[in-house]
């Protein structure tokens, strides 16, 4: 995995489309128990080079009930978004992830895993890409029906502040989905084959 990680970090496939230039932000290990696939790094993450090093990351860690030490341990969590670099700002938030990364790099990453990690699909870009025709008609439908995607995938909304209202109007998410997520994460962290 080290050689692959080195190639990913040198990737410049999308450089002409990236306003701040390429800086792929990933965290990988062949032994990871959980794989996080989301959209693309935000500006702050681009600046620090640390995945989920922002308010959304803090909230995601709260949802999973893990601290920074566990979250940034690649033996537990691999992180490879749909787009590895910050795509720039759009009219209502960041632009969509560049379409080149996932098809180019994800299959190579998955080949290097020693086991089969639980894949957290965070947001619609990741869910539509991986669940394809099995994806619900909306993020709400997909997340509500999370059990049908287990044990391979666990779909979640993006934990950004933009989605605070979504969490409020869908109380079942915090009442039912989050406890199940925390249970599965804890089981995987504590399982030593």
Where are the regions that the model predicts?
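A polyanion-binding, active-site-adjacent surface
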Residues: 1-187
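Short, basic, low-complexity termini and linkers enriched in Ser/Thr/Gly/Pro
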Residues: 190-193
């Amino acid at each position: 995995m080290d050689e692959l990680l080195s190639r990913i970090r040198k990737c410049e496939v999308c450089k002409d489309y990236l306003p701040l230039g390429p800086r792929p932000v990933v965290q990988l290990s062949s032994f990871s128990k959980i794989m996080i696939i989301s959209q693309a790094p935000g500006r702050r993450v681009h600046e620090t080079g640390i995945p989920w090093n922002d308010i959304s990351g803090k909230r995601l860690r709260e949802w999973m009930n893990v601290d920074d030490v566990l979250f940034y341990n690649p033996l537990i969590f691999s992180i490879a978004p749909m787009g590895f670099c910050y795509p720039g700002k759009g009219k209502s938030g960041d632009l969509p992830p560049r379409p080149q990364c996932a098809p180019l790099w994800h299959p190579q990453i998955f080949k290097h895993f020693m086991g089969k990690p639980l894949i957290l699909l965070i947001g619609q870009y990741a869910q539509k890409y991986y669940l394809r025709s099995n994806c619900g008609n909306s993020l709400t439908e997909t997340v509500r029906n999370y059990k049908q995607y287990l044990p391979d995938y666990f779909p979640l909304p993006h934990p950004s502040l933009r989605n605070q209202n979504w969490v409020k109007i869908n109380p079942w998410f915090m009442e039912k989905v989050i406890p199940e997520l925390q249970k599965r994460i804890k089981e995987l962290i504590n399982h030593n084959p």
